[in-house]
Amino acid sequence: ARRLLEAMNITVLETEGYEADDIIGTFAVHAPPEAEIIIVTGDKDELQLLNDRVKVYFTKRGISDIKAYDVAAFAEDYEGLEPKQLIDLKGLMGDSSDNIPGVPGVGPKTALKLICEYGTVENVLDNIDRISGKSLKEKLENNKEAALLSKKLATIFTEVPVELDLAKYELKAMSEEARPLMQELEFRNLHERFQTILGGSDGLFDLFGESVGQGSTGTAVEFLETQEQGADFFAI
């Protein structure tokens, strides 16, 4: 993967000890205030980063089905909550895919109801006596530390020591090595799609030397091109 990305002149950014979420979150928070940011991901954790200049394109099924999230779309899906409250939801309901335990026995519906009413995990735990249902009260009372830890685990770290000069990460035309490498890897369609977006050293040609039309884009690429051509920072 790294060899291919290098041939496509796409910057690969990694920092030891930090996850990709943390690096993306750092850019989302610390990019210049005028920058518009798009995050393409299959991980809903990134939704906590949504604000007026950050959008998330969530890949629901591979790259063939994408849902665009802004703050309003998030509120529609989460009963009016703000994106920053996603970590409170995860604090209660957990997330097995990220090894976040949550409160055992508290599912998404109950967690959403509690956060809608009390706002944060901390407020839920401070108001256990007011919550109806003996069983739910016991679950919350017996798992306070797990809830607080889960919220912390769900929170994206946004202070990763990375270079924040966006000019260094601008997309460039693909190198001469890109086409033969994609041919070797049998990525015919991928080459055509990225040629349309990025261009290349020898024009728009497919892997077999035939001219490629400008409209030769796949579902995800076409979506991204038509939705947000003016984005300043784009992360996958």
Model feature map: region roles:
Residues 1-162:
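Extended two-metal-dependent nuclease catalytic cores across DNA- and RNA-processing enzymes
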Residues 168-236:
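Long, highly charged low-complexity segments
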